[in-house]
């Protein structure tokens, strides 16, 4: 007998829908009270999409004669949407644990960068690594993210800086997209740094004349799927003009603009992003008041990275100001050799403590708003009928434990589910 549905999550103490009216993002007063059902159940169909969410008794009656491939008793537990990590650099070779010691001794990000460390160190090792080596380490990192509750990950290239290695990184992301259970959003980040021996203008020319046309060709053939274009818009890296040229080139070929801006110096990157119709801008530690207003008006998402501010001892992004002005605030781990954090629950905790976000604001920023930053909030980021059945089940009677708890989340998370299939069970 064939099952009529894939999964029933029944009798949960709480089911956190996040949204209940098909919202693509949450801002302002909508963030104060997320949609939460007490004593509820969730049904996922064989197509991997959510078929019903509602009070347990109603669901039980509605689906009484039907069968399920799997039923999970969620009594005393909470069901939340799978978490969305809106900013990661997960494909690379070359550990940089030695740089952590330098930072603790007082070296800045730019000190290390200028001494040949930082991105340059990783670039050398990533260029030398085989595709298989990169895939194996990437797969392990995704596994760690998944065990901390992440089901949709933005993944950047950017440690090649030459066409050959950038494509190698994007092929690794593409292979993972096809073979693994997590949802991935691929970002071409060839303008992550200026390669040795080139000026920023020469690097931009190379990207526009060679990298982007090749990407377009590979996308057209179905060999690669790239979603976003990224540039590190920063003093001493890519200035506003070269950033504009590269982003416009990517936009012309249908890529969403999603870039690093206003991190170490005020660059007016937020104003540029709003003008170009960017989907998202990350970092924003040094964003201007005008930039915040422009992003709110343009519905351009701010991807804030509390791990980076914490590890580099930067000033915190002004999350409260952005939230109060109506900016769509999202969160990311910024996982990279410089910020070695896999865990979105940890990111949410830091966002609450260091950036003064509330727990509902942080959860929305790590679900529906992070999905919006990737242009995927119509399919991901909330537990609503018709959306992908990505969820986590935590062994706690209130959902806030996911953020309140500082570390040890693999003990709290009992199940991780994508498209209605259990991909991790404690």
Curated annotation (Swiss-Prot):
N-formimidoyl-L-glutamate binds at residues 159, 336. It catalyses: 4-imidazolone-5-propanoate + H2O = N-formimidoyl-L-glutamate. It comes from Mus musculus. 4-imidazolone-5-propanoate binds at residues 159, 192, 263. GO terms for cellular component: cytoplasm. This is Probable imidazolonepropionase. Pathway: Amino-acid degradation; L-histidine degradation into L-glutamate; N-formimidoyl-L-glutamate from L-histidine: step 3/3. Belongs to the metallo-dependent hydrolases superfamily. HutI family. The keyword Transmembrane does not apply. It comes from the Eukaryota. One of its GO terms (biological process) is L-histidine catabolic process to glutamate and formate. Gene3D superfamilies: Metal-dependent hydrolases (3.20.20.140), Urease, subunit C, domain 1 (2.30.40.10). SUPFAM superfamilies: Composite domain of metallo-dependent hydrolases, Metallo-dependent hydrolases. Binds 1 zinc or iron ion per subunit. Zn(2+) binds at residues 260, 334. Pfam families: Amidohydro_1. GO terms for molecular function: imidazolonepropionase activity; metal ion binding. Its cofactor is Zn(2+); Fe(3+). It is an enzyme of class 3 (hydrolase). The keyword Transcription does not apply. CDD domains: Imidazolone-5PH. InterPro entries: Amidohydro-rel, HutI, Metal-dep_hydrolase_composite, Metal_Hydrolase. Fe(3+) binds at residues 260, 334. Keywords: Histidine metabolism, Hydrolase, Iron, Metal-binding, Zinc.
């Amino acid at each position: 007998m064939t099952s009529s549905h894939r999964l029933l999550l029944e009798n949960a103490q709480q089911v956190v829908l996040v949204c209940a009216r098909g919202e693509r993002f949450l801002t302002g007063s909508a963030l104060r009270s997320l949609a939460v059902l007490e004593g509820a159940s969730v049904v996922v169909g064989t197509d991997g999409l959510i078929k019903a969410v509602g009070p347990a008794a109603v669901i039980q009656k509605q689906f009484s004669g039907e069968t399920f491939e799997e039923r999970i008793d969620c009594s005393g537990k909470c069901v939340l949407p799978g978490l969305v990590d809106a900013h990661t650099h997960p494909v690379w070779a070359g550990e940089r644990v030695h740089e952590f010691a330098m930072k603790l001794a007082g070296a800045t990000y730019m000190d290390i960068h200028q001494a040949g460390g930082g991105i340059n160190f990783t670039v050398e090792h990533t260029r030398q690594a085989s595709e298989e080596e990169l895939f194996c380490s990437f797969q392990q990192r995704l596994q760690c993210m998944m065990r901390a509750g992440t089901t949709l990950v933005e993944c950047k290239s950017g440690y090649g800086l030459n066409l050959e290695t950038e494509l190698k990184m994007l092929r690794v992301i593409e292979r993972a997209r096809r073979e693994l259970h997590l949802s991935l959003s691929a970002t071409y980040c060839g303008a992550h740094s200026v390669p040795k021996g080139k000026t920023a203008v020469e690097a931009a020319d190379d990207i526009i004349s060679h990298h982007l046309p090749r990407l377009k060709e590979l996308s057209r053939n179905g060999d690669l799927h790239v979603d976003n274009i990224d540039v590190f818009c920063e003093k001493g890296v890519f200035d506003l003009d070269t950033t504009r040229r590269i982003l416009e080139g990517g936009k012309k070929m249908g890529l969403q603009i999603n870039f690093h801006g206003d991190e170490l110096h005020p660059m007016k990157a937020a104003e540029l992003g709003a003008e170009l119709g960017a989907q998202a801008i990350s970092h924003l530690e040094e964003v201007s008041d005008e930039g915040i207003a422009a992003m709110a008006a343009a519905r351009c998402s701010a991807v804030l990275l509390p791990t980076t501010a914490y590890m580099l001892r930067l000033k915190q992004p002004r999350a409260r100001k952005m939230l109060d002005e109506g900016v769509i605030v999202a969160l990311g781990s910024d996982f990279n050799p410089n910020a070695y954090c896999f865990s979105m629950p940890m990111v949410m905790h830091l966002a609450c403590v260091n950036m003064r976000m509330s727990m509902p604001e942080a959860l929305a920023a790590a679900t529906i708003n992070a999905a919006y930053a990737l242009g995927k909030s119509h399919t991901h980021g909330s537990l609503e009928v018709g959306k992908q059945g990505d969820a986590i089940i935590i062994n706690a009677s209130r959902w806030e434990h996911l953020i309140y708890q500082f570390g040890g989340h693999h003990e709290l998370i009992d199940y991780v589910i994508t498209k209605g299939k259990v991909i991790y069970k404690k």
